[in-house]
Regions:
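C-terminal edge-of-domain segments
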Residues: 98-176
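Conserved hydrophobic/aromatic beta-strand scaffold that supports enzyme active sites
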Residues: 16, 27, 43, 63, ...
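Active-site-proximal "nucleotidyltransferase
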Residues: 1-15, 173-175
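Short beta-strand segments
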Residues: 11-48, 64, 74-80
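A structural signal for short, well-ordered beta-strand segments
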Residues: 32, 92-94, 138, 142
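A generic structural signal for nonpolar/aromatic side chains embedded in well-ordered alpha-helices
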Residues: 9, 55-56, 110, 140
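Short gly/pro-enriched beta-turn/loop segments at secondary-structure junctions
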Residues: 12, 83, 132-135
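Short, structured beta-strand-loop surface elements
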Residues: 48-109
Length: 176
């Protein structure tokens, strides 16, 4: 299960980050950085004035959900329509803001992860010190995680009967 959770985090692009501040729950979708070489760490970035990053920088607990939708499953029976997906839920705690060199390293790794093959100075301008100083990155140490997935075709009672009325199958939504 930890290998599956790590694989889902490595494949995902958007995390939904949930936290409670002053009794009010929040969920914020965010790009994130995850590297299987440091499997219990996840990184978030944003404005130094960000409510979320400021709150988590004080060590607050957070829940993170990442879901990848792989396909729409249609059935000849309404009850058996479904979605193929991979998901992971993590429970973690925030830590203080990373220093400038750590922030630079995480931001470079994020660009490489989201935009493979791009290089600073060739494909985009090198980040200036003021750009790095204007961005907060915090590390989250994952305490617990669990993965869940649904794979496969429809499982309705008549889905394997080609002469039954209606249609059944999977619309593949996975990105190459």
């Amino acid at each position: 299960m930890p290998e599956e959770a790590a694989a889902f985090l490595a494949a995902g692009l958007v995390a939904h980050v949930a936290f409670v501040q002053n009794g009010q729950p929040f969920v914020i979708p965010m790009a994130y950085h995850y590297d299987v070489a440091a499997p219990r760490m996840l990184y978030l970035h944003g404005s130094p004035g960000s409510r979320l990053l400021h709150h988590l920088g004080g060590g607050a607990p957070v829940a993170i959900g990442v879901t990848l939708v792989d396909g729409l499953v249609y059935s000849r029976t309404a009850l058996y329509h479904s979605v193929n997906y991979r998901s992971v839920v993590c429970f973690a705690r925030g830590a203080p803001r990373l220093d400038r060199s750590q922030t630079t390293a995480v931001l470079e790794a994020m660009i490489a992860r989201y935009f493979p093959g791009r290089r600073a100075g060739r494909d985009y301008d090198e980040p200036l010190p003021r750009d790095i100083d204007g961005t907060s990155v915090i590390a989250l140490e994952i305490d617990e995680w669990s993965a869940k997935a649904r794979r496969g075709g429809p499982t309705g009672p008549r889905d394997n009967q080609p002469d039954a009325p209606g249609t059944a199958g999977v619309i593949d939504l996975r990105c190459p």
